[in-house]
Amino acid sequence: LIRAHRGQLATARNIRRLLEGSQLAARPKKHVQDPYSFRCIPQVHGASKDTIDYVESVLTTEINSTTDNPTVFPDEDMVVSAGNFHGQPIALAMDFLAIALAELGNISERRTYKLISGARELPKFLVANPGLNSGFMIPQYTAASIVSQSKGLCMPASVDSIPSSQGQEDHVSMGSNAATKLYRVVLNTERVLAIELFNAAQALDFRRPARSSAAIEHMVAEYRKRVPFIDNDSVMYPHIESSIQFLRTL
């Protein structure tokens, strides 16, 4: 192995599995290199997966720990005033996970932009009559706005502190703020990924009659039961909402 990060390896294996048997993947290649947002999916997604695993380990330790104060040891007949209530381990993990998930949204939006840019023989804005129709331009605007918001939400809460209780509590973790920011990033990233799916399914239909893999074709067939191919301009947000609901079934 030339780069043995577990998340990268798992992502690469998953991509190969999902694309097995794809006619599109087997086509002769005309381009020397793909954009980073496609070529580096294992490296970027994998790093986020490694972060998720790390955060899971922190949370597993925390929920199996005693975080009371004071700590009571009945067998030793001891009551000890200590600091296990401090939320720093969780606060740092929440901030770290927010960054990792925001990056999944960030790279997803870049792929969405490439899909609507008229590259690789796809029509501009993924519609048959661009210019007359703005097609998928506005969903990409939406994704760009959301990822920009998530970047702001990635300012670490755990680097902040404010004293209370007459200075006795003079360093606090701000873990609850980190967690609420993380929750907003989770929802933002989910929406950005749904927009990418919306665009990718449209792009795949423009590749017909070539077929992708059996796994991808099955997923797209199920997706098309909820979200149609877009011929002309229409209100897009119901399709984005339907895409979110579909993602939650996977």
Locations of regions flagged by a protein language model:
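C-terminal auxiliary extensions adjacent to catalytic cores
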Residues: 1-250
